[in-house]
Each structure stands twice: as structure tokens, then as C-alpha cells.
UniProtKB/Swiss-Prot annotation:
GO terms for cellular component: extracellular region; plasma membrane. This is Lipoteichoic acid synthase. Catalyzes the polymerization of lipoteichoic acid (LTA) polyglycerol phosphate, a reaction that presumably uses phosphatidylglycerol (PG) as substrate. Is required for staphylococcal growth and cell division process. It is a multi-pass membrane protein. The keyword DNA-binding does not apply. Residues 1-7, 65-68, 141-153 are cytoplasmic. It is found in: Cell membrane. It comes from Staphylococcus epidermidis (strain ATCC 12228 / FDA PCI 1200).
Length: 646
């Protein structure tokens, strides 16, 4: 490389760094982030939003002199690039953006190494090529740099321009998306309108506000929530109320399961033949085909949290990680106090993942059968932990010896991203979509279906089937929007935002002893499971704070809110600010009569649930029907025998 005729000055290096980082951010918008950008205004906003914070941050280093200025600008640029790339990798895996809250979950990343590494792409060098070039110049081609001081009078101009551009950006954003900063349920909106860097600043401010909320919370805040949830309560259905009193409850978590798999064939073979039978209505199970997950960033942990507490997860981060030491009125604790149930969770991963070993104590869960209770030899492990077949087999053995009635929650793992399976376990050919994630998903889902069938057979052999409520559900979507092209090949139809919402159906199957099965087409979500189960065992939900409604109730609320503020009803869905018909997923030209009421209810639900978590409001609840859980009572010893409740 020959010496350039004109050296690179400090200000020129600053402009070059701002330009290349901004360019990389544009690249991420269109290649990696699914932001749903439409129209001239939104594209103009994308052009503006990265520049303001990049320029403002890096302009601070213009006050330094000589080599220091070059190096500080470089380091600042590298940190911004690292933040961008971290968001890219995180988005590929979670379809969401990094927050300060998710940093508290960083310990989970080590356990998910294979899944995270699968998120890397061949073109990722684009995000670092400028950084490498600048570093090479700073180390090996210092003669190219002009270290002479330049007039600092330009620096305040740059800063003022950056701030002015931010407010102009915000004005455009508020015009296109009113109340953007007050209705902040969806991070994609915030990044689309503010950019990833301003979003990080905004998230930091919100995190501080939420931390202050607990200190300022009072019993009056709880009263407001109680008054609201009591108005939402639905009466139990007399036909089902108490039908399963003191029966065992077995809750089976199907990792990443989506119901587009039901009755789906690949190369002429059913992907989920056993679940297909359970979905027919001719078995012991009632199938809810319009059951949706309601998780946020916490994914699996949000699913557990919502179904055991009838509360929403957090808008940022995982409630397990951030609110694990709160006071709760959980389903396992209520079952114990009202009907003497023992409770346990069974999972082929280690107990510290998702902070479970601490959270479960606050839920009043008696026993935790983690990976130390299972044979974790190499032949039994794939992806994140224990394969489903040996997991189910060992779990059934443990359950056959449990004190009854018990509440047992089994969490599977094999059908987890990146959906890899040992050759000897694969018994269905992969489709050929050209996407290893989608193709692998078919094989791992088929394996999960086989494992589930073997487990149900074991329950029958061990005499547990007839006297147990058995609940099966998918915890969250498995295939994100990043794989829409492959999904279109697999399903043979266009994946629009409305269709992707339909794909968030994760299924719910429920066997109640003494009741025949069927198909229940009510629209419901994970929030509704807790009141449904309480009524089945004969415990009235009226004395407990819950946001869901009994799925068997004749007054069941068919509005299903999502964590980002979208929602779906029997007739239409609200997605990314637009309303679509459920019949054909076409955009509605007229607003439904009940739309404003439903939208207000969804926003109020999310707001109230957030206040419960951020204010730790259950600590103020004096409920004569519930004694607060003492987490100090619980200890989860390592296997093989554990600490079983006698």
C-alpha cells in the first residue's frame, strides 16, 4: 500500500468512522432485522436514526489531540459496532433486541453454545471489515495519519446537529407511530423508529425507572390491580368445576412446538402422528387448536412463569432472571395449601439455568429433578441437554413413586434450536427447503412426538394415566421470521405478518379423568391455564389475582394479547398497527366495532401485569385464602435421590 497523497486528519477519520458504522447499521436493517419497513417516511427515518447517537458519541473524542483522538474514535466505533453485531446475533436467535435486562441472563449463553454458534452467518465479516482496516492503519500505517490539531469550533456544531437530527427523527417517528415512547411493548417498533443505539439509551432509562418503581410501590397500587382483575373474572363451568379434584396434574412442555405440524406430512409421512390422534377429538384429550403462546424475551421461562402465575412476562428480559425474588401466588403453592398437592419440576438441564433453582423456591415448588437426576452420558445428550426419550422414561419411573396427589411439570429439550438430531434417532427424512433450521425442525419434532407417545404408554403401564389430569402444550414458536422463505416452501403459502401471527399457535391438549375428549375452538393463551386448572380441581379463582380466564367458562374472554401489544380475537388480529381478517388474512378497510375496547383492554392488561412485577405487589397482598410462600423452606439437592417432600 503506497502513501496517500493527502493524509487523513482527525476530523476526516471521525467522519469516515461515522459513515461506515451508519452504513453497517443500514445493512443490518435490511439483511438481518425484520422491521416491516414500508413507505417513504419510514425509509427516511431509517436513514436518520443511526447517525444521531453515533456522531454524538464519537464527537466527544474530537476534543482529544493527536494519537489519542484517533484511538478513542476507533475504540468508540468498535464498541458501537460490537453493540450492533451483538444485537444482530441475538435477533437471529430470539427475534428481539438486547436490553440491559437480558444482560442478567448472560449466564444462559454458555449453556446454549451450539444454538448461539448456529446464529453466525458467512457474511458477518461485513460488520467488522472497516474495524480491521482502521486498526491496521493505526498500527502499521501511522504515516497516513495527520496528528495535527484542528479547529475545535466544529465540534459543538457536530454535537448540536446530532441532537437536532435526533429530535427531527423523533418528530417523524411520532407522526408515523403516535405515542411511540409511551406504548413501548414492541422493541421492533422502537428500533425501527429510533435505531439500535438510541434504543439502548432508552432501555437504560426505562430500566432505572422500573427499579425505582418497586421502592415507590404501595398497597394502593395492588388495590388498583385487584379491582381490575376482579372485573375480568369469569364464572367456572359447572360441568367441569371440581371434575378433577385431588387428581394428579401432569404438565408436559413441548419445546418450540407449533401447531402447523399437526396433520403435516413431509415426503408422504406424518410429522406428528401421535399428536394428530390426540387432536382428532376422538381420544381422551380435548384439543384447543386456537391456543397461542404469550411469551416475550424470556421465551421458555416466560411460558413457565405465565402458566404458573397467570401474569405476563416482562417487556424486557426474563421475569425469572429479573424478578425471581419477588413474592408470588403461584399455582403449585395454591394447590399445596388448598388440597395438599406435592409439586415438582423435571428437566434434563441443570438447575441454575434461567435461575430456576431460586425462582422455584418463591413459587413453593417442593422438588426439582434437574440433570443430576438423569443419565447424562454422551449417548443421551443432544443440543442443550437430555434427549426426550430417556428423559420421559426416567421421569415416569420417578412419578410412579411420588406421594399423591402431585403436580408435575416436565420440560422437554430435544426440539430446541438449532434442531439437530443424532442419525440413529432420526426416523423421518428432512424436507429440502435449503434451510437447515426448518429442515431439522421436522426431524426433532417427529422425535418429540415419538417420545411423548412412549411416555403416555408408560403412564398407563404404571397406573398413573387414569387418575391424572394431563396437559400438553407448546411453549413458544420454534421457527422465527428469519426463516420465512423456507417456511413458504414447506407450507406452500406466503408468510405475511398476519400469517406469522397464525403460526404462533402452539397447541394445548387436556385430558380430564372422567371427561370425554373433543375439539374446543375457543381462542386462548398461556395466561388462561392457571384459572382453568384451579377450577378443574375445585378451587375458585375469585380470591386470587390472575389475568387469564377459565377456558371452559361460558364467559371466557376470546381476546388473546401478545407481549408486544398485538392481539388476536375470533374474528380478526391486530399486528404491527394493522388489522387483518382471520378468514383470509386480508387487511380490513373498516375498524371492527369492538376493536378500540379490545385494544384498550390489552394495553391495560400489560400495564397492570407489569406493575405487579415491577412493584413486587404481592408482598402487600393479605389474602385469607393464601399463606405467603417462604422460599427458605425449600432446598433442591443434587440427584440421584434429591430432597422429596414427605
Amino acid at each position: 500500500m503506497s502513501l496517500p497523497k493527502k493524509k487523513i486528519g482527525i476530523f476526516a477519520f471521525f467522519l469516515l468512522t461515522v459513515f461506515t458504522i451508519t452504513l453497517k447499521t443500514y445493512f443490518s436493517y435490511y439483511v438481518d432485522f425484520s422491521l416491516g419497513v414500508k413507505g417513504l417516511v419510514q425509509n427516511l427515518i431509517l436513514i436518520m436514526n443511526p447517525y444521531s447517537l453515533i456522531a454524538l458519541v464519537l464527537s466527544v473524542f474530537l476534543f482529544f489531540k493527536g494519537k489519542k483522538a484517533f484511538w478513542f474514535i476507533f475504540i468508540g466505533g468498535f464498541l458501537l459496532t460490537f453493540l450492533l453485531y451483538a444485537n444482530v446475533v441475538y435477533f437471529r436467535f430470539f427475534s428481539d433486541f438486547l436490553t440491559f435486562s437480558t444482560l442478567n441472563q448472560a449466564g444462559n449463553v454458555e449453556s446454549m453454545g451450539g444454538a448461539v454458534s448456529a446464529s453466525f452467518k458467512w457474511y458477518d465479516f461485513v460488520y467488522f471489515i472497516d474495524t480491521i482496516i482502521y486498526l491496521a492503519i493505526l498500527i502499521f500505517k501511522r504515516k497516513w495519519l495527520d496528528n495535527r490539531a484542528f479547529s475545535k469550533k466544529f465540534v459543538p456544531v457536530v454535537m448540536a446537529t446530532s441532537v437536532a437530527l435526533f429530535f427531527l427523527n423523533l418528530a417523524f417517528a411520532e407522526t408515523d407511530r403516535p405515542e411511540l415512547l409511551t406504548r413501548t411493548f414492541d422493541h421492533k417498533y422502537l428500533v425501527k423508529y429510533l435505531g439500535p443505539y438510541n434504543f439502548t439509551v432508552y432501555d437504560g432509562v426505562k430500566t432505572i425507572e422500573n427499579n425505582q418503581q418497586k421502592a415507590l410501590a404501595s398497597e394502593d397500587d395492588l388495590t388498583k390491580v385487584l379491582n381490575y382483575t376482579k372485573q375480568k373474572r369469569t364464572e367456572p363451568n359447572p360441568e367441569y368445576y371440581g371434575a378433577a379434584k385431588k387428581k394428579n396434574i401432569i404438565k408436559i412442555h413441548l419445546e418450540s412446538f407449533q401447531t402447523f405440524l399437526i396433520n403435516k406430512k413431509v415426503n408422504g409421512k406424518e410429522v406428528t402422528p401421535f399428536l394428530n390422534k390426540l387432536s382428532s377429538g376422538n381420544q381422551d384429550f380435548t384439543y384447543f387448536p386456537n391456543f397461542f403462546h404469550q411469551t416475550g424475551q424470556g421465551k421458555t421461562s416466560d411460558s413457565e412463569f405465565t402458566m404458573d402465575n397467570s401474569l405476563y412476562g416482562l417487556p424486557q428480559g426474563s421475569a425469572y432472571s429479573l424478578k425471581g425474588d419477588n413474592t408470588y401466588q403461584s399455582l403449585p403453592a395454591i394447590l399445596d395449601q388448598k388440597q395438599g398437592y406435592t409439586s415438582n419440576v423435571m428437566h434434563g438441564d441443570y438447575k441454575t439455568f434461567w435461575n430456576r433453582d431460586q425462582v422455584y423456591k418463591h413459587f413453593g415448588i417442593d422438588n426439582f429433578y434437574d440433570a443430576t437426576y438423569y443419565d447424562m452420558s454422551d449417548d443421551n445428550i443432544v443440543n442443550l441437554g437430555l434427549k426426550d426419550k430417556p428423559f420421559f422414561k426416567a421421569s415416569a419411573d420417578y412419578q410412579s413413586k411420588m406421594k399423591k396427589p402431585f403436580y408435575s411439570h416436565l420440560i422437554t429439550l430435544t426440539n430446541h434450536y438449532p434442531f439437530t438430531l443424532d442419525e440413529e434417532d432420526a426416523s423421518i427424512d428432512k424436507p429440502n427447503t435449503g434451510d437447515s433450521t426448518v429442515d431439522g425442525y421436522i426431524q426433532t419434532a417427529h422425535y418429540l412426538d415419538q417420545a411423548l407417545e412412549e411416555y403416555i404408554t408408560d403412564l398407563k403401564k404404571k397406573g398413573l394415566y387414569d387418575n391424572s389430569v394431563i396437559m400438553i402444550y407448546g411453549d413458544h414458536y420454534g421457527i422465527s421470521e428469519n426463516h420465512n422463505n423456507a417456511m413458504e416452501k414447506l407450507l406452500g403459502e406466503k408468510i405475511t405478518p398476519a400469517k406469522f401471527t397464525d403460526l404462533n399457535r402452539t397447541g394445548f391438549w387436556l385430558k380430564v379423568p372422567g371427561k370425554s375428549g373433543g375439539v374446543n375452538k375457543e381462542y386462548a393463551g398461556q395466561m388462561d391455564v392457571m384459572p382453568t386448572l384451579l377450577h378443574l380441581v375445585g378451587i375458585d379463582s375469585k380470591n386470587y389475582l390472575m389475568f387469564g380466564s377459565d377456558m371452559f367458562s361460558k364467559q371466557h374472554n376470546n381476546v388473546v394479547p401478545f407481549r408486544n401489544g398485538d392481539f388476536i380475537t375470533e374474528d380478526y388480529k391486530y399486528v404491527n398497527g394493522k388489522i387483518y381478517s382471520n378468514k383470509d388474512n386480508e387487511l380490513l378497510t373498516e375498524k371492527p366495532k369492538d376493536f378500540d375496547k379490545n385494544k384498550k383492554q390489552v394495553e391495560k392488561d400489560l400495564e397492570m401485569s407489569d406493575s405487579v412485577l415491577n412493584g413486587d405487589l404481592f408482598r402487600f397482598y393479605k389474602n385469607p385464602d393464601f399463606k405467603k410462600v417462604n422460599p427458605g423452606k425449600y432446598e433442591y439437592k443434587s440427584g440421584p435421590k434429591g430432597n422429596e417432600k414427605k
